């Protein structure tokens, strides 16, 4: 069973993913901490899993859930690195695909920024997520699910 697993605590494209997978046979699993609890009723193809509010509780649950034919959306580079050999595709909500070539650079940049902040330096946060970013993600995501999950062999 193909599913899209979303690291859902801070994912700005959750609604886009749910909308783009409607009627495709692809299931969506959103993993969130209880601090992000919602009573919004979701479509039948969507499953919301709530976990404790611990620092990596969502990540641990995602690692347990993922299968080799899944697509995972996360902005967490550490989680992405753990999933590269488990999931079919691991992508960021900005639309880029994590792979063995870029993950080490991303982790090194994250570490260098953390060290700089620890020594008293200040770093800029991420740029605001725009409608253009949403459109870019939707285009890339749609192409991926059609290429890897919806095309059938004749």
From Swiss-Prot:
Pfam families: DUF188 (PF02639). InterPro entries: UPF0178. It comes from the Bacteria. HAMAP family: UPF0178. Belongs to the UPF0178 family. This is UPF0178 protein SSP2038.
């Amino acid at each position: 069973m193909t599913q899209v697993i979303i690291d859902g605590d801070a994912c700005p494209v959750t609604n886009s993913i749910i909308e783009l997978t409607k009627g495709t046979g692809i299931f969506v699993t959103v993993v969130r901490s209880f601090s992000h609890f919602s009573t919004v009723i979701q479509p039948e193809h969507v499953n919301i899993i709530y976990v404790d509010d611990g620092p990596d509780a969502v990540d641990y649950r995602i690692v347990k859930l993922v299968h080799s034919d899944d697509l995972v959306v996360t902005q967490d580079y550490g989680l992405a690195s753990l999933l590269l050999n488990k999931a079919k595709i691991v992508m960021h909500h900005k639309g880029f695909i994590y792979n063995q070539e870029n993950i080490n650079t991303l982790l090194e940049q994250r570490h260098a920024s953390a060290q700089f902040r620890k020594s008293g330096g200040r770093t800029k946060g991420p740029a605001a997520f725009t409608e253009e970013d949403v459109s870019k993600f939707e285009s890339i995501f749609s192409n991926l699910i059609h290429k890897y999950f919806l095309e059938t062999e004749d």
